[in-house]
Amino acid sequence: MNRLVIIGASGHGKVIADIAIKNGYDNIVFLDDDKHIKMCAGFPVIGGTCEAEKIAGDKIVAIGNAEIREKIQSGIETVTLIHPNAVISRRVRIGKGSVVMAGTVINSDVTIGDGCIINTGASVDHDCKIGQYTHISVGAHVAGTCEIGSNV
């Protein structure tokens, strides 16, 4: 059984759950600090974010706020998830805990930091550097040789 613990039971978490299924995860659970949330995308919410270290399985933080994402991710090991419909050059480096959504194009010699979100339909062209915990929004296009800092 391939288990993924998604930290953050909201819209972003729902999209990550879909990507996880496409990547072969067959046991998905969520953690969230809102005790009123019991299910997300048809999967159970089994506890709060502080329990992440104790729960077995691969982990990913699905929280849009960069500061919160960094704080949670700094205390745990996380996986990187890439939607199978993303087009990524063989010469791309993607950091731990980052998520690449459907329809994304990432071209040659791009470096993406830890905990980043490269959202649906975005493109990052050649020789770019994307800092840690940065969000490239839905449909955004980053021209070649750009550098974007951390927590943007």
Q: What kind of feature is each model-predicted range?
A:
Residues 1-2, 27, 56, 95, ...:
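A general structural motif
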Residues 7-10, 63, 143:
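Short glycine-rich loop/turn motifs that provide flexible caps or phosphate-binding loops at active sites
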Residues 1-49, 53:
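Hydrophobic, well-ordered beta-alpha structural blocks that scaffold small-molecule cofactor pockets
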Residues 17, 36-89:
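Phosphate-bearing ligand-interacting subdomains
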Residues 80-152:
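Structural signal for interior beta-strand "rungs" in well-ordered beta-sheet cores
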Residues 11-12, 66-68, 124:
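Short alpha-helical
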Residues 8, 59, 78, 125-126:
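Generic structural signal for conserved hydrophobic packing positions in ordered secondary structure
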